[in-house]
């Protein structure tokens, strides 16, 4: 053995020096999500929902939250475009959520601040079409034919 050369010993399983350091990649980037997986995991642990939290739970929850947010934003953007607006306001979010069947049931008990209410008029309160107005619009009768009596032969 050569006692002049010193061999560096690092921690087991780790690379000890040499190559360039790898840049850390977040779990959000690894999973292809925009929502913060690490923060959601921290909230799950801090909230004491369970003694232990698996590694896949925050990723799954972040994916679900991101999907719901994208769905609501898409429908609210459509509602804003229908109203000829470029900016989404709480009214557009309310219209989007309440007009969608599945989101409406999911967020049934939720109050959206400054959202207002859905426009709704009870059909009983709407004006009825009268029989006279309906008959005059269908076939107009001329008064000359109504006064003449049929000829007898």
From Swiss-Prot:
A motif (SPKK motif) lies at residues 149-152. Residues 133-147 have a biased composition (Low complexity). Contains one SPKK motif which may interact with the minor groove of A/T-rich DNA sites. Phosphorylation of this motif may regulate DNA binding. This motif is reiterated in both termini of histone H1 and in the N-terminus of sea urchin histones H2B, but its presence in the C-terminus seems to be unique to plant H2A. The keyword Nucleus applies. Gene3D superfamilies: Histone, subunit A (1.10.20.10). It holds the Pfam family Histone_H2A_C. GO terms for cellular component: nucleosome; nucleus. Belongs to the histone H2A family. Residues 1-30, 129-153 are annotated as: Disordered. It comes from Arabidopsis thaliana. It comes from the Eukaryota. Not ubiquitinated. It is found in: Nucleus; Chromosome. Core component of nucleosome. Nucleosomes wrap and compact DNA into chromatin, limiting DNA accessibility to the cellular machineries which require DNA as a template. Histones thereby play a central role in transcription regulation, DNA repair, DNA replication and chromosomal stability. DNA accessibility is regulated via a complex set of post-translational modifications of histones, also called histone code, and nucleosome remodeling. The nucleosome is a histone octamer containing two molecules each of H2A, H2B, H3 and H4 assembled in one H3-H4 heterotetramer and two H2A-H2B heterodimers. The octamer wraps approximately 147 bp of DNA. Residues 1-12 have a biased composition (Basic residues). The keyword Transport does not apply. This is Probable histone H2A.4. Keywords: Chromosome, DNA-binding, Nucleosome core, Nucleus. One of its GO terms (molecular function) is structural constituent of chromatin.
